[in-house]
Amino acid sequence: MNGGVSRRALIGSTLALSAVANGAEAQPLKRKLKIVVAGGHPGDPEYACGGTVARYTQSGHDVTLLYLNKGEGGCPHRSGQECGAIRTAEAQKACRILKAKPAFAGEIDGQSIVDPAAYGKFRKVLEGLAPDVLFTHWPIDAHPDHRAISNLAYDAWLHMAAKPAFYYFEVSDGEDTQMFAPTDYVNISSTESLKREACYAHASQAPDHFYPLQRQVTAFRGIQSGYSQAEAYIRYVKSPGGLLP
């Protein structure tokens, strides 16, 4: 383990101890919630939050996986249109596994636009979904589409009259997501198998390579938080809390 990972582990472990001391194991949610997980591409919400999504839907809550684009650039030797169709079908399959709903924001893979018009368009999409809880990418990320939807989601949150709880997630930690020091953890020990199945629904995206790496992350987050497997989040400091499963 290199020095950078060790520092992140130390920071995360300190926060985890604080979270456990303050009762990190969530209490049952008493009302039906609407949850939106906003990711850059098909597969991002599943890899980041699949276990958390399964816990929500198993408890009867409504979850929408909102993809910024259809992943048109993710299939070597295929056209963008063909790849987008393949990955849309994979996203729909993953959502069926997690009992979530798919939605697409209409941008193009690798060509994300973040300007006043894009902010307004995304805000309308999010307001139409009216989430009680919003998850999106941590903005310090190597992928421009991840940074784009993070900024779009944050701007929408700032302008929403009824502000949802707002959490950032991690993907491909150390490769895409950078400098991620969690504030909250969700125990996914009972739902990791569903997360795995949903991630493997994205068959065009080499899950045999990427899922074992992601499972190392959730195992590490489990060590930090006292669970077998956990997904980690950063709650925006001005966000409501208490709505994690």
Residue ranges and their predicted role:
Residues 1-17:
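N-terminal secretory signal peptides and thylakoid transit peptides that target proteins
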Residues 4-5, 84, 192:
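Short alpha-helical segments used as structural interaction elements across diverse proteins
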Residues 12-13, 25-38, 108, 113-245:
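Metal-dependent de-N-acetylase/amidase catalytic core
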Residues 7-8, 87, 146:
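Short, cationic motifs built from Arg/Lys/His that form the positively charged side of catalytic pockets
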Residues 11-13, 26-129, 158-159:
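Active-site rim/loop-helix segments in enzyme catalytic domains that contact anionic ligands
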